[in-house]
Amino acid sequence: MFFSSKLTKWTYWHAEKDASLGKAHKTGKGVAAGVNLARDLGNLPPNDCYPEYLSGVARELAGQYEKLTVKVVSQAQAEKMGMGAFVAVAKGSERQGQIIVMEYKGSKPTKQGPVALVGKGITFDTGGISLKPGANMGEMKYDMGGAA
């Protein structure tokens, strides 16, 4: 490894003095906050990060941003909507299943139409449990990472 003993140049940008940096700084902070939240949710055990908890976090997040809305579909509502596969999986838990629908309405309408991102938010997926080695059971909590 090479370590320089002399500092030859130091450059410092300040967001308040350069508008383009201010926007980039704000975007960077938002991305970092999202990454940190997803990591923190993924690290929670499933007895702490269960469907109601995850939907509560989504609602809190929507409360912080006016362009973000959250609708939660309960297990009973999902059953009425004919979502049999979801309801069947949810019945395998002592907790009620929930579907979280988050919508971000940006400031500019686009000609391309909306973009939809779908993330699997199953907080502890036991599908195929008989096929999974016991040593990896603890990692099933990460199945909700796509939604986080």
Task: Please report, for each region that a protein language model flagged, where it lies by residue.
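N-terminal hydrophobic/helix-forming segments and targeting peptides
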Residues: 1-123, 136
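Alpha-helical metal-binding/catalytic segments enriched in His/Glu/Asp
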Residues: 58, 115, 126, 130-148
